[in-house]
Amino acid sequence: MPITNLTKKTWLATKVRKADKFVTRLVGLLKRTQLGPEEALWLMPSRAIHTIGMKFPIDVVFLTRDNRVTGLISGLVPYRISGFYLKSYSVVELPNGTIRKSQTEIGDQVEISLVEVSEMDDLKDTRLSHIG
């Protein structure tokens, strides 16, 4: 399930885990020691997150129901709580530095594509070929 910034024609992640149940949102990335460069956690519904108990900083992208960026936090360090983003419906937690690398800004349109796991290897070689 890749996440693409359609406005900037850049990728945020190619390996995304969806957390849409209470327990998966609560646990989040707590058991992880790091995120790979193309990994992300997509939490829904969510308007705020915390990094209490986490071991590494993350970038955070807040999205509306139609996946428009409504908030950004770069380098949120462990043991912090984000602000509450009233217009957000979901949150994407990404490796530190992803917001800068992807040039993502508030107002950008993001696409989260459902892709079969077997298709993930093909995506790495054809990045952005489907974006006009």
Where do the PLM segments sit?
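Compact, glycine-rich, soluble single-domain proteins
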Residues: 1-132
